[in-house]
Amino acid sequence: MIQSFTRLAVADNSGAKELMCIKVLGGSKRRYATVGDVIVASVKKALPNGKVKKGQVVKAVIVRTKKEIHRDNGSLIRFDENAAVILDNKREPIGTRIFGPVGREVRYGGFMKIVSLAPEVL
């Protein structure tokens, strides 16, 4: 469950290392985001030679959350960290590599490029 002011790790090679959620997209009163949801975030830590800079406002999709995700088959899954992948205006990832596993719910959101780049889909 990601909400405003939540800090997230970045799971791609766009140059950013840490994001802070500004807003959860998808409704005027929407408070929480989970795996597969898009957020607006600010870059808090970045590499000096990366594609994104510190302070830049970006859109990102959540790929991992510490809060467990309940699946339709009765199972649940949780990850060790909250992580996101930075998107461009066409909802494609800025980076060319994805680090770590991603949740299967990312596929249902239409982010097939992220699913194909990910080393593991859980």
UniProtKB/Swiss-Prot annotation:
Highest taxon in the source lineage: Bacteria
GO cellular component: cytosolic large ribosomal subunit
InterPro entries from the UniProt entry: Ribosomal_uL14, Ribosomal_uL14_bac-type, Ribosomal_uL14_CS, Ribosomal_uL14_sf
Gene Ontology BP annotations: translation
Keyword Nuclease: no
Molecular function in Gene Ontology: large ribosomal subunit rRNA binding; structural constituent of ribosome
CDD domains in the record: Ribosomal_uL14 (cd00337)
Alphabetical UniProt keywords: Ribonucleoprotein, Ribosomal protein, RNA-binding, rRNA-binding
Keyword Ribonucleoprotein in record: yes
HAMAP family, per database record: Ribosomal_uL14
PANTHER family to which the protein is assigned, alphabetical: 50S/60S RIBOSOMAL PROTEIN L14/L23, LARGE RIBOSOMAL SUBUNIT PROTEIN UL14M
Purpose: Binds to 23S rRNA. Forms part of two intersubunit bridges in the 70S ribosome.
Subunit structure: Part of the 50S ribosomal subunit. Forms a cluster with proteins L3 and L19. In the 70S ribosome, L14 and L19 interact and together make contacts with the 16S rRNA in bridges B5 and B8.
Similarity comment: family membership: Belongs to the universal ribosomal protein uL14 family.
Protein's UniProt name: Large ribosomal subunit protein uL14
Originating species: Campylobacter jejuni subsp. jejuni serotype O:2 (strain ATCC 700819 / NCTC 11168)
